[in-house]
Amino acid sequence: MLFRGQIRKMITQLAEPVQYYLNISGDIIHLNELFGKKISIQHIGYQCIECGSSEPVFRMGFCKKCFFESPFASDSILKPELSTAHLGVEERNLEIEKNIQLQPHIVYLAYTGDVKVGVTRESQIPTRWIDQGATFALPIARTENRYEAGVIEVALKQHISDKTNWRKMLQNEYEEEIDLLDFRNKIESLFPVESRKFAINEEKIWKIDFPYTAPEKILAFTLDKHPNFSGILQGIKGQYLCFQNGDVINIRNHEGYVVDIEI
């Protein structure tokens, strides 16, 4: 069966294990049903996720023009502490920025090979954690807007990483030794004084079961360097497809790529 279209990040459904669906221009492919089967991917072009142009993807699925103009690629998307919608100050499009920023946000701890701190809209739980490949996650603060969550994250990331090391995430090491409750208790004092009112004492640690077993070796590839790829799908974690022999590809990093996929 052949599918042609634009890659978007995989759709996920929390289950045991997580269910994954590949979205190719609206064609939805249930990937869990394809484990042990051959998938061929051929890169044939680009389609910006914002304007639809065939210009090469610059970053995050956007062409260069849209990356520097779209409110969905503004600085506050990557750095919540730069949010200004709560002040009525526009970055690129105030109405869109209000919709994104002026809603409850969660500051969380997650285990993705190391313990990390992060920020997400409350409505994006647990999708955000699944996309990051977090096997454990714990909300530690709930704020009224994105800026407030960013202030907490800035304070905490002086002591804890806010990045995911994709290789460690895919190696599955030390997962059973992580106690996020204990970790939270140790860092509560690092909250800015004015932000401590947002702290929450969740007792439930989220555990996410991925359809994935770490291979002996991991070799990441991109469609830029390998525009024609075929392999046997073995597992999925985060936004990574893992094939036989340890070849892995980050689907989210290929948003906006146009491909032929044969199953």
Regions found by a protein language model. Name each.
Residues M1-I263:
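Non-catalytic accessory segments flanking enzymatic or RNA/DNA-binding domains
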